[in-house]
Amino acid sequence: MIAKAKAISHGINDLRYITGESQHKKHPEKIYRVLDNLLPSEPDAMGIWNSMQLTISQHRPIKNSVIRIELSPSPKHTQFYDIEDWQKLWQDFAEEFDKQVITGKDGKIRSCPTNLANSKYSVWLHTESKGEVPHLHAAVCRLDENGNINNDHNIHLRAQRAAERVAKKRGWTTAEQIRNRNIPQVNRDCMEVLKAMPSWSWDEYKNTLIRKGYTVHEREDKKGL
């Protein structure tokens, strides 16, 4: 199971997307409300946004006022899921998300436990993606109902670890296990490409890997290399 999380400033656009109200969503009929927390009864995107903004206005302004979360379990684990099963999956994930204390290499606390449990959020099931792989989208208010901020330091790690813990508890294949299983094949493919090249060329190397089905992410160093 894979999870992503990020604090964003364009919360209303994200809400329109996850609720299926965005014009970019071609099949809103394949998007389902899973659950809302501390919100009015079944609000639309603007209703969710206004409710979150009300909470923020009562405490302090914050730029990135919404946490965007995506949760993607393997389809084989959720093929017989109903809405209540998806609700339980989200609640288990949120519990693991909240309880973590993230420390730096020096042992100092970088991020205290979050409080999604007492924060406004809305969770939706999307089944309209390529291959119709079901996955969850959530939008969470950065401030809980007591005015405390949900820290976003290393929030992507918080999400990944929460997903790993839930997957392990359920006996599911984890992202780490998939990565470890794929490493030998990736190494073999890379070496085969290198051995077949008459001379070194980054572009040729990259394009050959892409033709093999890999996605190559390029990063420049401080020298632009």
Describe each PLM feature range.
Residues 1-225:
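N-terminal nicking endonuclease/strand-transfer module with a His-rich metal-binding environment
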